[in-house]
Amino acid sequence: MFKVKCLRGHTLRLVALASVSVFALPAFAQVAQNPPATTVGPVKPMYGNLRAFYGDLTPYYGNIRGFYGNLRPFYGNIRPFYGNIRAFWGDANPFAADLVPFWGKLRAFDNGLSAPTVGDYWTKAGGDWDGVEASWTVAQTAGASGDYSQAAAQLRSLVVSAETFWGSAVQAKTGQSFQAGFAAPLLAKYGLDLNDPTSLSKLSQSDRSMFFLEWYDGLMNFTGTDHVDHWMKTVNWTPQLTQTQGYGADTVIGLLDFTVAGDTVIQKNIVKYGGVSNFTNGHGAAVASLMVGAHDGQGVMGIAPKASVIAYNPFDASGTAGWADISKGIVMLTQNRASVINMSLGVPGSTLDQGWNAVFSDPAVSAAAKNAVFVVAAGNDGVTQTANINWNFATNPSLIVVGSIDLAGNISNFSNTPGTACLLDNSTCKPGDRLMDRFIVAPGELMLVSDDKGGVTRMSGTSFAAPLVSGAIALLQDRWPWLANYPKETTDIILKSAKDLGAPGVDPVYGVGLLDVTASQSPLDFNKLKWYQVDDKGKPKEQALKDVIKTVGGLPTTLTEASVSTVVSTSMSEQQLKFDAKGMYFYAFEPLGGTTRDFAIPLSSKLIGQNVITANGGQEQFQSYLLSRMNVWVAAQAAAGGKTKFAAANGFVEDAPVPNSWGMSMTVSIAPRPAHYGFRQDGPDYQSRLKIAGEKVVSQFGFGDGAVALANVRGLNSASDYDSDRGGANPLLGLASGGTFANFAYAMNDKLQISAGTTQRDVRRDRSDLPGLNFIDTGAERYQASAQHFGADYAVRPGVNVVGSYTRLHERSALLGTQSLDAKDFRQGTTTDGLTLGVGADLGHRTTLGISGTVARTRQIGGGQAIRIEDGLTSTAFEMALTKVGFIGKNDVARLTFSQPLFVNSGVLGTSTVQVIDRSTGAIGVVNNRIEVGQSRPLAGELLYGRQIFQRTSDLSLFGRVEVNPGAVVTQTFMAGGRIRIGF
């Protein structure tokens, strides 16, 4: 704490806020060896050098001795840190087998250690340390008579276990053994001699805690990756988020702090430096490391590692500073384009001192600082602000005050708090002007930071909570650069996205709550997002939300600008789309005071396939699909005799032909109507068919699965074969199947038969599964399709037929079964023309083989669609099915299929979207995009088995399916099940 002479002749104490060094880990010196090698030099001298650093900070120890004493609750409250490290890292889970969700593009664990084994090691080491600590405590509690032999033995075991796991990594990095390169220097630092159990008596409980933390941090230096620290999960931050948002590369941060003297990595980010001296104590580097620490495989990771830093040191050679130096620093930083200023300094005894008003009211300061956000540490006296602050709102900039929480999420015992103090506007406390309304908290205890000597250390204080907020702002202003000109809106984003802590709402202890970095980079309220349609003249078309909500029969009559929540909240966990929409986006906009910010949302999030699995029923829908396949299978297999009757293979149960005077047979068939999940089951529960057969002419009329009747390929006579998502036989017929159908066949001679037919599907979606469809008239609430089919069937020899056909599919507001929650995307629909070649063969021994392959080309109907087919889409599908009756027993049936469901091989889609066209200003306009589509080929294999049991009164069926889709999030799935039906 420094006494200085400040403005107006008053004595002011201005300090960097309680940068308490808990311990420091060394930088590994590089030395030349023969043969040349990069190794790690001696550790002990670096520890010795740090003794002076401890000495310099002695005045602060008295303030936080209680904090050290309270470290035991730290271990107790986050026991997962040691007991189960995966729980400590939480959702980020950097030690899982799949590192991408946390690390993103960073290369982690490239030194031979695997991520899962590192996690397993710390799981065991945590439990071992608990045992050491328990024995140590018992011995110390006994006083002079305490026996430390058991604790010493357990500690030796911990060291041996660490040597077994980490020895090779230490050897590779230091050129020394585990003992010489790591363990011995650290044990010596704490005065521990494992051959002398009495040496353990010298360490207090807090010293033991510090030893194990340093043991942990030291070993993690050898992982070959950046350090992961507790604060990352707490503030909901991952390196991947930083990568997505741009690393902070287009943001300039102002650092008003001590000089960064020895950290050459951080110095690379400092593009300009000023100040009254080069005085340093490591505080500036520690603060900066949390903002811009490089993601380089070692040390501290910052939230915005590529941000530029303008630095100013207001402290003179004596380590003191006054308001005049602070004012000069602010002007220098803001004049050099710093849009967020981190100030981890303040006046002891207050959360926000009145002196700040004088600084910001100065004309020179206010003119330069008006477009910057100032992030100020709250201070470390553990006081609650009681005095109001007279505040000049006309001149003073946007401000965020940051307090500290501990590792259990409670306010730090040293952190100052806002209380009920207010920023007074002409002696009046107005709504939103309380200090607590501008107060946020972030982790500030035991923070891993740069020691400014090339290594890392742990420090505590509000000084280290503030840079987390500054780093989050740097990400914001990198992703949305124009926010640098909107400091109030930027401040609002940080404060409004905070996670509530303490008493509900804004409170005198935690203010608005806990910093949430991910939430700040996300929409504050999805319900307020909007997107723009492009009108027929190619112009953005916007309409007030109140006009969009006007409805007729519960559905809007217009949709130009719409709430994106109706899209996003649908949250489908699976969408069976026939084309890859990767790289295609639409843009939603969030109103923010005088500006907006945009969000690129994958186009696929507003596209709906024909087999939808919703977020609130994903597992139930899967089970329903599985059960449905069982039911169809049992009902669809041909078997002779028995008290239970298997249906014909196409699902229809045929009655005996009805004789008539015309010489033609008439057959009426019925079958259960299969469900289309995600759609309403209107009308009768059964499908039906009337078949009229003459000498050369066969006519069929019906309601239901017309695809089987029209395709007429032997061995491919199950409706599931024509499912565009699951089967591979003529999917164009499958997309139009389910409603009325008709087919006419004429025998040209004994071998050749020609046919013509039509089928249609007209179904409404079940909006109880898709709540978004209750609010907007999208065109996707109803799927309508029809198909015309022309075929020729040639008998190559008895029992072997070759079938060729042409199919034209018309879809309204859809593309190959895919629809959109934006009515304009597929406004006038599409037409698809397909050619199919099939072979049906009776192989004898009650065995049938069916093969079908389809190639198709799709074009759009008319113009004005938001998603345009600019180059016809080419798609394919195929299936091969082998069916054996009497597989094991006389009347059982087995069926093996191999298929490639419908998918788009090639083509070009075009979109017109309204998006930001100038990222420096946020200006929006219409952008036309061309996307080449295509995806990895999906493949599927399926095995079905059914037989009658219990003297043919009951039946058993088994089902198994494997799907391989290299382009999907889940590249391989396996499904299996069985069913027993018992008859009485």
Regions found by a protein language model. Name each.
Residues G143, Q154, S161, F165-L192, ...:
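Substrate-binding/access-modulating region of protease and related hydrolase catalytic domains
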Residues L592-G838, A968:
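Outer membrane beta-barrel translocator domains of Type V secretion systems
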Residues G727-P731, S755, D769-R782, D793, ...:
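Outer membrane beta-barrel transmembrane domains
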Residues Q150-S157, D196, S201, Q205, ...:
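C-terminal subdomain of the subtilisin-like protease fold in secreted/lumenal serine endopeptidases
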Residues I253, D257-V260, W391-A474, D478:
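Extracellular S/T/G-rich loop segment that most often corresponds to the catalytic His/Ser-adjacent loop
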Residues L290, Y312-F315, P443-Y510:
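Hydrolase catalytic cores
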Residues A37-V40, K44-G48, V118, G126-G127, ...:
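Protease zymogen maturation seam
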Residues P239-I253, F258-W323, N336, T395-S398, ...:
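Subtilisin-like serine protease catalytic core
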